[in-house]
Design a protein with these regions (language model features):
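Histidine-centered metal-chelating micro-motifs
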Residues: 1, 40-43, 47-52, 70-71
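Conserved short histidine dyad/triad with adjacent acidic residue
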Residues: 1-6, 36
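His/acidic/aromatic-lined binding-pocket segments of jelly-roll/cupin-type domains
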Residues: 3, 9-14, 43, 53
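Glycine- and acidic-residue-biased ligand/ion/polar-headgroup-sensing regions
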Residues: 7-26
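Short acidic-glycine-tyrosine-enriched beta hairpin
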Residues: 11, 25-48
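Double-stranded beta-helix
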Residues: 27-34, 52-111
Length: 111
């Protein structure tokens, strides 16, 4: 589910496999797409960046670095149009992540 960490940067390092990392604007449009583990070997996102990560390979592992102690995400830090993990529509949304490009928006999201 697309989310943000308002108070910390996030650094992603692929340990095994490849990962699609999508960044979004406040309205849910994709602003950036990176395949971590191909030509990109590390990705740092500023605090407050809306993003999601999808593993492209079975058994993929990514190392995340954030500042400070673990803080669970508040509902306000997840995109309301995206279903929570395990909810109806999750499989369709994850399939879309794999092919989505900058400028795209998830078709079934409320307008």
């Amino acid at each position: 589910r697309p989310h943000r960490h308002r108070h910390t940067f996030e650094l992603l390092l692929p340990l095994k496999g490849r990962f699609v990392v999508l960044n979004f604007d406040d309205h849910g449009a994709i602003t950036n797409r990176v395949v971590l583990g191909e030509t990109c070997t590390a990705l740092e996102m500023e605090a407050g960046t809306w993003h999601t990560v999808l593993s492209l390979d079975a058994g993929g592992m990514v190392f995340e670095v954030k500042q400070g102690a673990y803080q669970p995400l508040a509902e306000m830090d997840t995109m309301a149009w995206a279903p929570a993990e395990g909810q109806p529509g999750t499989a369709e949304m994850m399939a879309w992540y794999a092919i989505a490009q900058p400028g795209d928006r998830f078709l079934s999201m409320p307008q």
